[in-house]
Amino acid sequence: MASQLNRPLLSVSNLLLLVATIFLAILLWQLRGLLVTLMIAVVLAAAIAPIVNIAERWRFPRWLAVIGVYLTLVAGLTGVGLLVGPTLIAQIETLVRILPLYIDNLFGLVEQFALKLGITESEIEQFFDLQALTGWIIRSGQQLLVSSYDITTGILGGIFNLILAFLLSGYMVAGRENLISGLVNLFPQPWSDRLAEQVEPIARRMGGYIQGRVLVSAILSVAITIGLGILGLSEFALALGAIAGFTNLIPFLGPILGVIPALVVAISQGGWTFLWVLLLFIVVQNLETYVLDPLLVGSSVQVHPLYQLLAVLGGTQVLGILGAVIVPPWIAGASVLLENLYLRPKLLAEGKVSREPGVGSRESICSNW
């Protein structure tokens, strides 16, 4: 008993482990910009790996396939930029300049509608402070942009980090075997073999998600641009379509963010234009939800919607808009580890899934969490 009482509550080894953990956490926080770049690189690598694998099956060297894929991407993006870039930039500049006037016009219409309902101006100011609401919207948008801006150290730093992410992703895909072998060998047996088996399904799920999401957003952007042009908003159609397409990369919240600028512009053109634009977005969003997402994204993210929403909110809180885009595919990849290394063994032990191939599929496993 006396020896137990005299025993130190915190051993030297535990103290060293605690200090090392704190030091590692501080180091990771200081290197968060590099970590974000690595996160982007992994997502990009997972997205292009299937294309490289196809080229490799056609007897192309893997390094040559990686270079070919990137040259094709750069050529495509350059062509699109030269084709629509000047018009898009001009429309965005005009939209940024004139949008505050449209917002003031919108609030004026709201006040007029409230007065028709018998609500006095003093009651409007008391319960619905439009000026404070406008300020909150502007500040919230600035905070989101500043979060992403700080992480990437400004615009030039962001461009540099994006280029670095592309280069790193190319290296990851080209040297996949050596890289994976080096990482999993850091873990003792049998975990090294178990983790090596999870690399392919993780890459497939992350890559499938980002490929589908980018393709769906591109289709949505083109559809909205064409629709707004037909409805008489050709002056801002390209900019509003690009905004809607980019924000659509963000699950759940993105479609809502994308429709707001278009509706603000539309209502200044009249009530009928507003209704037609609203109908356009409703049709396009339903087409995405019931046709494009099941067809192109499918079940690549087999995670409960609540967890996906929390991933978006958490990513936005830490990394701004950038986090809302890159965190969900990481959650999708992490779900593979959770399913295969914890949920499936647990359900097998409980007899709820079968060991036979094809029985106890991922869908049935995912439905348990």
Positions of predicted regions on the chain:
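Anchoring transmembrane alpha helix of integral membrane proteins
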Residues: 1-86, 90, 169, 332-353
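Membrane-interface starts of transmembrane alpha-helices
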Residues: 61-69, 126, 130, 192-195, ...
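Membrane-water interface of transmembrane alpha-helices in multipass transporters/channels
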Residues: 32-40, 161, 231-242, 269-276, ...
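Alpha-helical transmembrane segments of multipass membrane proteins
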Residues: 22-27, 74, 78, 168-169, ...
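Alpha-helical transmembrane segments and their immediate interhelical loop/hinge regions
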Residues: 13, 151-267, 271-279
